[in-house]
């Protein structure tokens, strides 16, 4: 048998076709193409959003910001800043876009502060819809927001009115993951109490947050347990730090206090590792929910509005045609009346001449 023939012999048992290798083909294609993911972070200044994002992806994506003073907050407006970075790990490329919202919740009057954020989300849907409807659909860049980390202050007793308004305004457009920031300012008991309070208020106000899918029945027990723990950890209480400090003879990222060290990646100290695990293991699901639920809802609404406007235009056109015909009929009637009047005058003048 030649080498060429040997390459096409069936290495498996008789009756094996080879469909089982399809997932490997999809995996290889996906790895070559790379992955795209857009994460939005929303919350008041001073909650450590930039630090947490840098800690999550081990990159200096965002510089540390100066927290604005009281005078600066009076007329503070919300800005939208999108930063993209290419991350490669073991041959797998991730095009990560992080959308930051500096100024959110900082002004004295925060009534409309989330409207620029909603406009940004809708604009990304609109852009994707436009590209998807175009001729060149092979190289569409997906800038839709796949996930939103919403940062909740640890210094309150639950959700603020602004938190409720924002999440209710956005929960049908984006996968919202609530995050309680600066967990190192709370005791373990205070964390659990605040978590329960936030979850109760989320349910009370009918806010839809991202629901982690249940593990399949054929998944191994470790994955099922991991899924159970991740679900039980929502909202995640996290600590972020980019500083390496020495603890128990090893270098760790954390925060040093007079009473000890808070380690960022220690699950006994905070939920940082759980949050990162959730994001990495459910990145595909977050994208699918964005595509199948949020984007489809947006697309359906746009199509309905398009059809409604066309029907309205048709009705307007019919009314215009009818009005034009009525006007033309009136003009003809007036013209006939004038002609009859002229004929009558001519007839009367002719009779007078005969007399």
Curated annotation (Swiss-Prot):
Septins polymerize into heterooligomeric protein complexes that form filaments, and associate with cellular membranes, actin filaments and microtubules. GTPase activity is required for filament formation. Can form heterooligomers with other family members and form filaments. Interacts with wdpcp. Keywords: Cell cycle, Cell division, Cell membrane, Cell projection, Cytoplasm, Cytoskeleton, GTP-binding, Membrane, Mitosis, Nucleotide-binding. GO terms for biological process: cell division; cilium assembly; smoothened signaling pathway. Its main location: cytoplasm. GO terms for molecular function: GTP binding. Residues 259-269 are annotated as: Important for dimerization. Residues 43-50 are annotated as: G1 motif. It holds the Pfam family Septin. It comes from Xenopus tropicalis. Gene3D superfamilies: P-loop containing nucleotide triphosphate hydrolases. CDD domains: CDC_Septin. The keyword Nucleotidyltransferase does not apply. This is Septin-2B. Belongs to the TRAFAC class TrmE-Era-EngA-EngB-Septin-like GTPase superfamily. Septin GTPase family.
């Amino acid at each position: 048998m030649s080498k060429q023939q040997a390459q096409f012999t069936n290495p498996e048992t008789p009756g094996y076709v080879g469909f089982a290798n399809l997932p490997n083909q999809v995996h290889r294609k996906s790895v070559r193409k790379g992955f795209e993911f857009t994460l939005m972070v929303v919350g008041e200044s001073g909650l450590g959003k930039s630090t947490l994002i840098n800690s999550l992806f081990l990159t200096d994506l965002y510089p540390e910001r100066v927290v604005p003073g009281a005078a600066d907050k009076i007329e503070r407006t919300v800005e939208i800043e999108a930063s993209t970075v290419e991350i490669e790990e073991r041959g797998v490329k991730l095009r990560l876009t992080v959308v930051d919202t500096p100024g959110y919740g900082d002004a004295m009057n925060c009534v409309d502060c989330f409207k620029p954020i909603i406009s940004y989300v809708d604009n990304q849907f609109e852009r994707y819809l436009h590209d998807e409807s175009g001729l060149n659909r092979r190289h569409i860049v997906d800038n839709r927001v796949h996930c939103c980390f919403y940062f909740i202050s640890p210094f309150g007793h639950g959700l603020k009115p602004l938190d409720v308004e924002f999440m209710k305004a956005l929960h049908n457009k984006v996968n919202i993951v609530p995050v309680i920031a600066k967990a190192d300012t709370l005791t373990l008991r205070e964390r659990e109490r605040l978590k329960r309070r936030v979850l109760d208020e989320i349910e009370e106000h009918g806010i839809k947050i991202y629901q982690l899918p249940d593990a399949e029945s054929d998944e191994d027990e470790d994955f099922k347990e991991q899924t159970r723990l991740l679900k039980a950890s929502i909202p995640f209480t996290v600590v972020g730090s980019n500083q390496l400090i020495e603890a128990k003879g090893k270098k760790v990222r954390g925060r040093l206090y007079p009473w000890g060290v808070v380690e960022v990646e220690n699950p006994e100290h905070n939920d940082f590792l759980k949050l990162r695990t959730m994001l990495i293991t459910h990145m595909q699901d977050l994208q699918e929910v964005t595509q199948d639920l949020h984007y489809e809802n947006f697309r359906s609404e746009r199509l309905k509005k398009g059809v409604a406007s066309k029907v309205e235009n048709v009705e307007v056109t019919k009314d215009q045609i009818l009005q034009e015909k009525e006007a033309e009929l009136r003009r003809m009637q007036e013209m006939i009346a004038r002609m009859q009047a002229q004929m009558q005058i001519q007839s009367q003048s002719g009779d007078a001449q005969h007399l």
